[in-house]
Amino acid sequence: MSDFYHKPVLLEESVHWLVSESGMYIDATLGGAGHSKEILHRLETQHLLSNSLLIGIDRDANAIRAATTRLATYAAHAHILRGRFADLKLLLETNGLLDSGNHPIRGILLDLGISSHQIDAPARGFSFQQSGPLDMRMSDTAQLTAAEVVNHYDERSLSKIFFDYGEEREAKWIARKIVEARKQTPLETTAALALLIRQNLNRKSPVEQTKTLARIFQAIRIEVNGELDELKAVLQAAHEVLSEKGRLVVISYHSLEDRIVKQFFNECASEDWGPKGVVLDVPIKTATMKILTKKPVLASEEEIQENSRARSAKLRVAEKI
């Protein structure tokens, strides 16, 4: 388990909102199983475990191995599946876990972004702070890599990715410099890409350069893994499979993710009574979820001091009605 360490963010808050009664709980972003273990522990302490089941989903083989070890003491109540969380409904169906009368789906947790282990492993290529291959795949079975994006996407496509997924104002400039540089030598490592970007941002302070690097690497990672499309798909799937009063708990780490979650919750919680002036007995569209967190739940200063990754975390909760 030591090869996949990840300190869970907003652990107490997320499990508090998630666990209500016995049934099935899904950790769709299993990682090192920090949240999953706490969910099972909470069910146990509330005497709900005997008729409950935890489903953990992850596409990272290292995470699956670590989680299996970590949850060994709860093996009878934990079922781990390897796959993309966007395929949540299909994974449940193919494993005979959907529409299980004994285990209605009471809660689904999504802890978005990447794990500490993935960031800290140079060979995964997620971090600009240490040199590794330009990979950034969350699953080793995926085809598209960061190297493919950086070395083969045209300038316009790179610029769009940097602007749309990184919200980077220097998107066009950086895309142009990458295309110019790769004509001489392909960019094969995170260090080479980071150095190129820093060299072309020398008018900026080191702090500003680092922020730009974070945005560019985030943008490439989102493109490689299709993260925003995956998020939209899993939100819809989660909404479909949740039982009545089941809760969807989502932790996001940047504005793009949070915007999608907030918009989805608002759409599900709204009614449509048609155009003004038209009197209807029933709405065209009824609300299917109730938002339980009017404002996102944020990490405490104490948690941020212990885990800097918690600084940007936002937790939102909605309940199916």
UniProtKB/Swiss-Prot annotation:
GO terms for molecular function: rRNA (cytosine-N4-)-methyltransferase activity. InterPro entries: RsmH, SAM-dep_MeTrfase_MraW_recog, SAM-dependent_MTases_sf. It is found in: Cytoplasm. It holds the Pfam family Methyltransf_5. Gene3D superfamilies: Putative methyltransferase TM0872, insert domain, Vaccinia Virus protein VP39. It catalyses: cytidine(1402) in 16S rRNA + S-adenosyl-L-methionine = N(4)-methylcytidine(1402) in 16S rRNA + S-adenosyl-L-homocysteine + H(+). It is an enzyme of class 2 (transferase). Its main location: cytoplasm. Keywords: Cytoplasm, Methyltransferase, rRNA processing, S-adenosyl-L-methionine, Transferase. Belongs to the methyltransferase superfamily. RsmH family. Specifically methylates the N4 position of cytidine in position 1402 (C1402) of 16S rRNA. HAMAP family: 16SrRNA_methyltr_H (MF_01007). This is Ribosomal RNA small subunit methyltransferase H.
